[in-house]
Amino acid sequence: KKFLFIHIPRTAGRFFTENIKLNNFESETKFIWKSIDGIEPAHFHKELYEKHFNVADIPHITIVRNPIDRFISTSIFLTRMYGDDIQDMVEDPIMLSMMLDNFPLTEGANWFRPQMDFISSKTKIWKLEWGFGKDFEEWISDILDMKFTMKDVPYKKLSTDETNKLMRSGRLIENIRQLYVKDFEVLYPEC
């Protein structure tokens, strides 16, 4: 059975990808580190996966995450590229926008892309905050019409220091809300 897992960065994608393999599925993105149209295929947004993958007639699934938590998690790449002392800069909406628009690693552009840019009308959505227990197994098993079992797999760390994140300040959270308006409206209206 084929399906498309839309891997939105910083939403437990590596964990879920390992579980895909443990359930004897093969990933469409074997060339994960090769850039196509300036983006890693593993992190293709809707426009690119529809262009490069034959996915029109298969189920699409994704995992989303609270945009504030996702941004703070992704901020390890901002501190890596711009330095440790950038808290004041990211609290300025114009500076933050410039930093994201001019992010020096083009393949990483999708790390900060709104989650709604990855989602089509066909996409089945699971929220990271709901966990990966029996409810998740039932949800994905129903979509695939076959049993899917989650296993506890070790977290695959990046080569990046994942502890060097930005602080959650009121100003930064307001900037995040402005960056991801549609994510909040559609995916997280309760936040």
Roles of regions detected by a PLM:
Residues 1-191:
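Membrane-interface amphipathic segments in extracytoplasmic regions
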